[in-house]
């Protein structure tokens, strides 16, 4: 998805894209690490989850700089793994499908860049 120049955005909708993408990444990653915890997450449901995650990331990309800004604001307010994942995905020059990510590298980046918790 390419940003649409000079097209007004709806900030609340873009915020929802950021929140849902962060949440869906967290669900996806947790499932891959602990598949036994949710036996109902079969291949079809996992595929739907991936489609939704990609759609929310696309919604942020279409919003261009506003999408990046809003995702950054969500991360500033909630510095969690999902929010950092979204910010990082939006930094790429071209969209990278989540399926093509090296999950070990992605997890390592997140672990190394999340702020320390008290």
Where are these regions (language model features)?
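N-terminal alpha-helical scaffold/docking segments in eukaryotic complex subunits
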Residues: 1-117
């Amino acid at each position: 998805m390419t940003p649409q120049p000079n097209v007004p955005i709806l900030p609340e909708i873009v915020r929802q894209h950021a929140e849902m993408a962060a949440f869906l990444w967290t669900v996806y990653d947790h499932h891959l690490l602990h598949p036994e915890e949710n036996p109902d997450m079969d291949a079809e449901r996992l595929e739907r989850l991936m489609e939704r995650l990609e759609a929310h990331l696309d919604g942020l990309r279409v919003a261009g700089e506003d999408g990046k800004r809003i995702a950054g604001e969500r991360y500033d307010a909630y510095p969690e793994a999902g929010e950092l994942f979204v910010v990082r995905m939006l930094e790429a020059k071209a969209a990278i499908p989540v399926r093509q990510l090296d999950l070990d590298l992605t997890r390592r980046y997140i672990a190394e860049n999340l702020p320390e918790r008290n």
